[in-house]
């Protein structure tokens, strides 16, 4: 059950963000979201989404955090859960899961420290900049829909953290400081900056230009992406992230995009990867965004394939298993399945 009627939601979102949204570069015409959603989100698809969101909502604690596993109270998991609810049209205080979205926002705002860094040190992994990037992204999406002075103030500080910790190569690494860089952490920050700029916050052009240069230099000859500029083989998850980083920076066509899309189509993981690869859901989260942006036959062939895998791997209780935690897996899966909704600005062309 979606939160709001599609046309009502898109009109409301457009009215809320039209005056603030500033794209990084001129964009191509989008796919028709009405047609795509009607064709691809069938009743059984919506039923799977509903079961997933219901399970996810049931795992949320009163303070907005999620779960009781090793990633309980993790900021990135809270942020992705918020994105999952938003992707179904559930917005702060509106829709079936509006209350859950409000809790996510409250938890993330409370997790920001005096410097603007969003992280719960006791409940993070080895890479807290993942937490910060995902949190900044979802807060920017929410602020663009429903401007709030408290969110804007904290969001602006979070953006400054990203801008000031970019390293000389143009990327970011695990910690909120200038050091090394890798493509995986970098994509989180690029999407966060794109969302923030769309919502009307200042992001220096120089920051974007430097990260575009970093991502382009990370591409291997086969079209995939290396982990760090020191070299290394291409892998599907980080290659999907690399393509989306370019799209998020406003690069919608060109040789890098073409070769990246070709690589992804040639290296799509088999269905069994979902149960044994820590990065499988992560890779498909970015790959579905890349194919949505690529459009045409790329999208029309990609979504049904990953859709079928997700429906087959959903658990009886509505969740999706992942080696990180089921809350993470379920949030990722429901975001992927709801991509045709085209609700969120960060996923729009």
Segments predicted by a language model, with ranges:
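An alpha-helical repeat/solenoid feature that recognizes helix-turn-helix modules
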Residues: 10, 27-51, 65-100, 113-160, ...
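Acidic carboxylate motifs that coordinate Ca2+ or other divalent cations, activating on Asp/Glu
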Residues: 63, 317
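Active-site-surrounding "flap" and adjacent substrate/cofactor-binding loops of secreted or lumenal enzymes
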Residues: 98, 105-107
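Short glycine/proline-rich, acidic loop/turn segments that cap or connect secondary-structure elements
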Residues: 300-316
């Amino acid at each position: 059950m979606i939160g709001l009627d599609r046309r009502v939601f898109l009109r409301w979102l457009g009215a809320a963000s039209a005056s603030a949204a500033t794209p990084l570069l001129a964009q191509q015409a989008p796919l028709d979201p009405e047609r795509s959603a009607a064709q691809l989100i069938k009743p059984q698809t919506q039923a799977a989404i509903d079961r997933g969101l219901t399970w996810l909502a049931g795992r949320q604690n009163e303070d907005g955090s999620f779960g009781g596993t090793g990633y309980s109270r993790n900021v990135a998991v809270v942020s992705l859960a918020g994105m999952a609810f938003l992707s179904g049209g559930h917005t702060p205080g509106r829709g079936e899961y509006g209350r859950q979205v409000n809790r996510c926002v409250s938890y993330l705002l409370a997790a920001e420290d005096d410097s603007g860094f969003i992280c719960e040190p006791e409940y993070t992994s080895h890479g807290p900049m993942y937490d910060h990037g995902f949190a900044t992204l979802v807060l920017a999406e929410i602020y663009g829909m429903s401007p709030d002075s408290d969110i804007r103030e904290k969001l602006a500080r979070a953006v400054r953290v990203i801008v000031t910790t970019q390293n000389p190569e143009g990327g970011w690494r695990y910690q909120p400081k200038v050091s090394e860089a890798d493509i995986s952490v970098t994509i989180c920050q690029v999407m966060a900056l794109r969302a923030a700029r769309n919502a009307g916050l200042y992001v220096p052009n120089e920051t974007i230009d430097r990260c575009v240069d970093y991502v382009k230099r990370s591409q291997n000859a086969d079209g995939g992406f290396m982990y760090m500029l020191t070299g290394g083989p291409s892998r599907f998850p980080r290659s999907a992230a690399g393509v989306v980083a370019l799209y998020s920076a406003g690069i919608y066509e060109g040789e890098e995009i073409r070769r990246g899309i070709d690589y992804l189509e040639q290296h799509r993981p088999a269905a069994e990867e979902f149960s044994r690869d820590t990065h499988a859901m992560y890779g498909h989260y970015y790959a579905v965004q890349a194919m949505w942006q690529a459009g045409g036959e790329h999208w029309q062939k990609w979504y049904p394939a990953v859709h079928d895998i997700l429906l087959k791997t959903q658990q009886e209780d509505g969740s999706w298993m992942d080696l990180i935690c089921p809350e993470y897996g379920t949030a990722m899966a429901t975001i992927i399945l709801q991509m045709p909704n085209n609700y969120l600005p960060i996923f729009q062309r």
